[in-house]
From Swiss-Prot:
It comes from Hydrogenovibrio crunogenus (strain DSM 25203 / XCL-2). Keywords: Ribonucleoprotein, Ribosomal protein, RNA-binding, rRNA-binding, tRNA-binding. The keyword Ribosomal protein applies. This is Large ribosomal subunit protein uL16. Binds 23S rRNA and is also seen to make contacts with the A and possibly P site tRNAs.
């Protein structure tokens, strides 16, 4: 699963996930992409599950790029523990996603196969997504 090798601080404030994606909102590597239409959090498990289902669909033909990285730690306190006594331990890592962010890119397959693979991947994700193609200038 994806997670940072090391961070400056172990735990992070919750923060707010506002605004639109102004970085990573264009296709830069492949021909086709999967773009987020809503904001949300994408866990490292969800990123990996979507990657695996896409890889299985396209077999060996395609190159897939993952354009998001889970760099935010989410903490949790154990069950039946009283309030206080500090922040809980890190349970999992998430990537915060804004609308317009390209999540995955693909190259080396035809559009029909890419669209089917991205539909399977979108079923694993917690927000609405859209299939996009690279515009040729």
């Amino acid at each position: 699963m994806l997670m940072p090798k090391r961070t400056k601080f172990r735990k992070m404030h919750k923060g707010r996930n506002r605004g639109l994606a102004n970085v990573g909102n264009k296709i830069s590597f492949g021909e086709f992409g999967l773009k987020a239409m809503e904001r949300g959090r994408m866990t490292s498990r969800q990123i990996e599950a979507a990657r695996r289902v896409m890889t299985r669909k396209v077999k060996r033909g395609a190159k897939i790029w993952i354009r998001v990285f889970p760099d935010k730690p989410i903490t949790n306190k154990p069950l039946e523990v009283r309030m206080g006594k500090g922040k809980g331990s890190v349970e999992y890592w998430v990537a915060q996603v804004q609308p317009g962010r390209v999540l995955y890119e693909m190259q080396g397959v035809d559009e029909v196969v890419a669209r089917e693979a991205f539909e399977l991947a979108a079923a694993k994700l917690p927000f609405k997504t859209q299939f996009v193609t690279r515009t040729v200038m």
